[in-house]
Each structure stands twice: as structure tokens, then as C-alpha cells.
Amino acid sequence: MSDNHTSIVSEKTNINNTKELGEKVLQFLIERKIIEEKLTDCTLGVLGYKPGSNFLSVLEKQNGDFLNLRINGLEVITKRTVFHSNGENLKGIYCPNCKQNQIEKNWSNALDSWYNKSNSDLIKCSNCSYENSITKFIFEPNWAFGDFGLVFWNWGKFKNQFFTDLEKVIGTEIKVIYGKV
């Protein structure tokens, strides 16, 4: 059986504030009983937070079947990460200017540069010569680049209001990435 995940990412978070932001978001989720306060072995590879008694309040479909799964928690990421869908093959990397697919272009160097925080994370479109950071190109399926993210394992579909509430707590727009491992 595979595990599904929903990654909620702030692409505009300052790298220097990610730990404090993580604590602020955790406090918000714990106070509303969306997650439990105690860290447990409920995510893939790292400790996470199990669903709290009020987790159904943020889900579109009122279903707690995932509670029986070993992997069913929240993972908080506070380091530079590319959030992607895992199981789906990358179909396209589109220029934000002309929408031309750049997947055949050598973009892995730009990705490595972004990870290493160098200034050479640029891709130049082979169609219109538009040049920008790899983070500005449009990925299919959707990818997000950030220093702060929440990964909910096997929770299902969230209510839009939950995303709106998180944007207020985080202080930036968020990007949502759905995936499967």
C-alpha cells in the first residue's frame, strides 16, 4: 500500500525564521486540537505529530480511516526543500513567460544551485530567452520550493478554509502539493 501526502508550503518564508514559524504553526494546530502535542513515530523517517481530537474540522471528507495507519501524522520541515508529488513522473517545466516546456533543458544544475543558495539557479528559456530562477518556472505536476513546509501523511482532502487560516498564521501565501510514495 502506498502513502499519500499533502505538502503545504510557504515559498516566501525567510530562512532565518523557519524554526520560530514552525513553533507558531504547531501552537496554532495544537491549540485547535488538530494535532497532538507529543512527537511520535507517525511519519516516514522522522518524528511527527498524530492527528488530534479535532482533526475532522479541517478535512473536506469526514473520514478518520487513516487513523488505523502507522503513517498518519504531520511532519514539519524547516530547511530548504523541493516539495513534489514523488510518485508521478515530471511531465513539464514551463517558462512562466511563453509557457514553452523546458523539460529537455539541463535544469538540474539550476536545482542544485538553488539547494546550495548560490546565485546561479537561473534557467534561460530556449524559446523566448526569458531567464529566471528555477523556482519561478511552472512544474507539472506541481512543485514548490521553500524553507518551510507542513507534510500531512494520509489525511485526505483539506477544507479551503484551513489553507486560508494557515496563510494568516504563516503570513504568506501557501502552495499545496499532493503526492504519493
What spans do the regions from the language model cover?
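His-enriched metal-coordination microenvironments in redox/metal-binding proteins
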Residues: 1-8, 114-117, 142-146
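Short linker/helix segments within small regulatory modules
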Residues: 108-124, 140-141
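Short cysteine-rich clusters marking metal-coordination/redox-active sites
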Residues: 95-98, 125-128
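Residues immediately within or flanking Cys/His clusters that coordinate Zn2+
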Residues: 90-92, 122-125
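N-terminal alpha-helical interaction blocks
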Residues: 1-88
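Short, non-ligating residues that shape and space the ligands of small metal-coordination modules
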Residues: 102-105, 134-135
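Domain-exit/linker segments immediately C-terminal to small folded modules
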Residues: 126-181
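Acyl-donor (CoA/ACP) binding surface of acyl/acetyltransferases
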Residues: 92, 100, 115
